[in-house]
Regions:
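Conserved small/polar residues in nucleotide/adenosyl-binding loops
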Residues: 164-171
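N-terminal beta-loop-helix "entrance" segment that forms/cooperates
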Residues: 36-53
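C-terminal binding/interaction regions
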Residues: 12, 97-161
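Active-site-proximal loop->helix
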Residues: 21, 46-47, 76, 93-105
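Glycine-rich phosphate-binding loop
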Residues: 48-86
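Glycine-rich phosphate/diphosphate-binding loop of Rossmann-like nucleotide-binding domains
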Residues: 4-32, 37-38
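Short glycine/serine/threonine-rich phosphate/pyrophosphate-binding segments
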Residues: 13-17, 42, 67-73, 92-95, ...
Length: 175
């Protein structure tokens, strides 16, 4: 049974939503991913949101661009946490999506990550689930420890080769 529902409004959102799925997989969290347009398929959307709780979802990660009603409507129907991912758009750089998701009325909150913030949405979903799963909490602590060690290794490399040498390369990994 999937613990997290990942829903997006368009297949063009897949690269961002895949980052959330990747994090969930790394942490051993089951999920179900689907594409539903809240505007073009309202009947399909309503059935998805209404049935999410009985499917066993504890969190929904919803990504959408432009008018971005998908996350807010999920939050209006699904009684548990919804994480919204505003998608970058060509017309307004994603600000339209961001404002649509964060400006929710009282009583219908959507936890919102950065524009195209798929990875952080996955991490936030994991943190929500970890409040009642000690083993997952330990995996999250390990994940955070690995992030810290990665930064420390990059700094050690920078100190070893100097900024002048590094400047000619894109990242420490390119050396």
């Amino acid at each position: 049974m999937a613990l997290v529902g990942i829903v997006m409004g368009s297949d063009s959102d897949m690269p961002v939503m895949a980052k959330a799925a990747d994090i969930l997989e790394q942490l051993g969290i089951s999920y179900e991913m689907t594409i539903i347009s809240a505007h073009r398929e309202p009947d399909v959307f309503f059935e998805y949101a209404k049935s999410a709780e009985e499917k066993g979802f504890k969190v929904i990660i919803a990504g959408a661009g432009m008018a971005a009603h998908l996350p807010g409507m999920c939050a209006a129907i699904f009684p548990m946490p919804v994480i919204g991912i505003p998608m970058h758009t060509t017309s307004l750089g994603g600000r339209d999506s961001l404002y649509s998701i964060v400006q929710m009325p009282t009583g219908i909150p959507v936890a919102t990550v950065a524009i195209n913030g798929g990875a952080n949405a996955g991490i936030l979903a994991a943190k929500i689930l970890a409040t009642s799963d000690a083993a997952l909490l330990e995996r999250l602590k390990d994940y955070t420890k690995n992030l810290k060690e990665s930064v420390q290794k990059k700094d050690a490399r920078l100190q070893a080769v100097s900024y002048t040498h590094l400047r000619a390369h894109e990242t420490c990994a390119d050396l």
